[in-house]
Amino acid sequence: MGGRARSILRWLRHHRSRRVSSSSFHLTTTGDDTVKDLHDPRREDAEGDGWEEVHEGPESDPEEYIALVSEDAGTHLPVRTEPRRMDPSKKEPDFFTEYGEANRYKVSEVIGKGSYGVVAAAVDTQTGERVAIKKINDVFDHVSDATRILREIKLLRLLRHPDIVEIKHIMLPPSRREFRDIYVIFELMESDLHQVIKANDDLTPEHHQFFLYQLLRGMKYIHAASVFHRDLKPKNILANADCKLKVCDFGLARVSFNDTPSAIFWTDYVATRWYRAPELCGSFFSKYTPAIDIWSVGCIFAELLTGKPLFPGKNVVHQLDLMTDLLGTPSAESLAKIRNEKARRYLSNMRKKPRVPFTKKFPGVDPMALHLLERLLAFDPKDRPSAEEALTDPYFNGLANSEREPIAQPISKLEFEFEKRKLAKDDVRELIYREILEYHPHMLQEYLRGGDQMSFMYPSGVDRFKRQFAHLEEGVSKGEKSSPQLRQNASLPRERAIGNKHGDDEYHAKLNVGEKPCHASVTDGISKPLMSARSLLKSESISASKCIGEKPKQDRDQEDSLTESMDETADEVSEKVAQLKT
């Protein structure tokens, strides 16, 4: 056992006596009532994600803890949270008008809703696994939103890795040419890294190292497939109580092909400013590389170390000022690569700033961690390591193992031919339908044989949900509790072929961080869950995490008021720099 693994064990033993509140990270089931604890998120209003925060039930004790459980040690790693509790008796009708108990999924409650859809926590009755089901409403009202959904479900099908959120199933629509909504089933994650950072001021160096390792391992896989995520930030990294992380929200991701024009590749780039690489703050460099994601990883790592965003810029110019305040004035070589003349002139005329030693900026932090952080935050992208190179840094000695770091093959250009042409609504509908069939192999074979079936001979899951839960909606509207109507003589939905999943058990065993199952037991096909349904899906992205139960506006701190926003495109940014700082 390595030194860092031993230190985790000592930490666990030291905290053995600390008890965990009953309203922790777990889902507590008593009879028909389900009580779920939810985080208070920092709402990202400026990003316009469209989610309404649902406030139900009393506010929980802010000193309660989330239990990060190690089965080997039999102890808890306490992580503070400030949850709110949703009243389990109030099941929102918005979801159940379209969705309810079909043969496979037992819905427990609605856990999120917004302009783009509704999310429910459910149990897969075949496996006992807890899942999150997102119903995305009116997918094709806007072709741009539908294209983003198509891109994301395609990438999440092609990128299968333990550090990337997984789509488990997509329900077959009732009609090939007329469907409007889609139902996507995800593995259920409990929270996101933003909430973990915000709720904890006592994360250990082992946490920092473990989190960064998983993030870089995921990016190694993603970049090997020639994919750039383009929107990495703590809210787009899901987290579980066993300290496992998973990257989500691939709605802005792009596959890089050698013949992809830079102007086309970055036309719609609007990633969150605080985590945006300097070359994206003013169309700096003629060719973008995976180094844009590496910069974001560095910003996230710094936030893990300090508990605060590293570069919380109020606008693009302020963002550049914060970067140069820490990293110093860029070198002449770096400035020469800036293609926007006015942006280049602004930085060239900037007063000379010395580089701040990272030991001063981050006092008390492991020197090896700071050395790697400096590499990740190099101003010039050519000076940043690749994810694969970063994993060989001495900081990960005794932890990194290439056998646990699979890489993907580059994605075929044929998968993303749709990016090169203007799509009509019916085009996107057909492409999304084709992606859905990947989870219904029997129907896919018929489709590939040239079948032109417009509707299906057996009831689709969506049809059954509408029919079976009409009574539940009526009961909820009257303030009554209602149980889902049991299915009678409906055929089972087509099952997707189950592939092997990448395992990570050996790695967790080495770190003495045990795998915590998503359920304790299965009785009559329904699990008795241990975990809270915290991974909510926001906005037009189908996989991003969004917790509900927001703090009252007057209670938000100054940091929360500086919410990062989805910003201008690169060209607009250049013009803004020119106007403000000519």
Curated annotation (Swiss-Prot):
Extent of motif TXY: 267-269
Positions with biased composition (Acidic residues): 557-572
EC number: 2.7.11.24
Compositional bias (Polar residues): 482-491
UniProt keyword terms in alphabetical order: ATP-binding, Kinase, Nucleotide-binding, Phosphoprotein, Serine/threonine-protein kinase, Transferase
Region feature Disordered, mapped onto this chain: 22-61, 474-502, 542-582
SMART domains, per the entry: S_TKc
One of the GO biological process terms: intracellular signal transduction
Pfam family of the protein (one): Pkinase
Domain notes: The TXY motif contains the threonine and tyrosine residues whose phosphorylation activates the MAP kinases.
Protein name: Mitogen-activated protein kinase 17
